[in-house]
């Protein structure tokens, strides 16, 4: 099985938070991966060395500062009534709405959705902000969200 139900996700409450409702049509498009599939994706797209962003080290592309181009702040926008992602992110990422994206929290926790759904529900996803990395399928652009309210936009090497 490639996915688990949203209800079985450890922190499923983030997608059911009353102050940040998600459309019924978007919920089925938020697909937590089963552990085995998450492990394979993490190893392929994020790191073969470590299982969590806190432990990135030399040899992990996210550890290399040259892969990150700019930094911005997300927390103020997250706390506001503004619904759109920070402009730096939407300027850096020009993906089609149907692009498959992966929100990678750690080796065992990867959530697949589309770019359109992520843009609409980003505030829900950012309840998990501990260095999580957003990457697109067959795309080089990436974003890392940090718990201090900042993010970095960059390019994942081929």
Show which residues each predicted segment covers.
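Structured alpha/beta or helical-core interaction and ligand-binding surfaces enriched in interleaved
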Residues: 1-150, 155-158
């Amino acid at each position: 099985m490639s996915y688990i139900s949203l209800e079985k996700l450890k922190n499923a409450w983030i997608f059911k938070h009353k102050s940040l409702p998600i459309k019924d049509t978007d919920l089925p498009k938020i697909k937590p991966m089963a552990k085995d599939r998450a492990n394979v994706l993490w190893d392929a797209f994020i790191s073969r060395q470590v299982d969590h962003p806190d432990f990135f080290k030399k040899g992990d592309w996210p550890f290399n500062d040259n892969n990150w181009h700019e930094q911005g702040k997300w927390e103020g926008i997250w706390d506001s009534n503004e619904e759109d992602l920070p402009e730096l992110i939407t300027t850096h990422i020009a993906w089609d709405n149907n692009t498959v994206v992966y929100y990678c929290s750690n080796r065992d926790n990867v959530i697949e959705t589309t770019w359109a759904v992520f843009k609409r529900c980003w505030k829900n996803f950012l309840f998990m902000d501990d260095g999580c990395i957003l990457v697109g399928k067959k795309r080089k652009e990436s974003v890392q969200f940090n718990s201090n309210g900042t993010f970095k936009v960059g390019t994942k090497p081929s």
